[in-house]
Amino acid sequence: MNRLVEWAFSKPAKKIGFEDVVQQRGKCALINTLPPSKQECLISGTLDLKQEEDFINSLLTKYTNTSKPIILYGLNACDETPYQKQRQLLSLGISEVWVYSGGLFEWLLLQDVYGETEFPTTTAAKTNDLLMFRPSMVLSRVF
């Protein structure tokens, strides 16, 4: 088992772009890694927290890990939580786990440009401030 964990952690992250999410939505399990306080606006088709738990448990107990690929996404491109979750799922033996690296921020920006039909969300992102989903500034604290 130790070698499996080492193997899972040594593999480079499998990443995808927004076009894969658009094309594969509904065919894959879409899971977010946002904190519970930020679950009000999600990419349409995202499993809610209870569904996610049930889905992962069914994979682990029924050994059906090849049945449905998983797409993970976080808040934005700097969010490391999807990669942490990917490593966790890989270490459990779930192999088809992909990270949409642009995250919710990129999705909402695309929705703002191309419309909700192409980039649907659970609440139509009725927020006036898309920048609340942007990455935090890092270099301003360094220099």
Language-model features: locations:
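Short loop/edge segments at beta-strand edges and connector loops
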Residues: 14-17, 50, 101
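Catalytic cysteine-centered active loop of the rhodanese-like fold, especially the PTP/DSP P-loop
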Residues: 58-108
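Short acidic active-site motifs
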Residues: 20, 54-59
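Active-site regions of enzymes building and remodeling cell-envelope glycoconjugates
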Residues: 42-51
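Flexible, polar/low-complexity N-terminal or interdomain linker segments that lie immediately upstream
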Residues: 1-41, 116-143
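Short active-site oxyanion
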Residues: 24-30, 44-45, 69, 95-96
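Structural motif
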Residues: 33-35, 51, 75-76
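Glycine-rich, charge-decorated loop segments at or immediately adjacent to ligand/cofactor-binding or catalytic sites
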Residues: 107-117
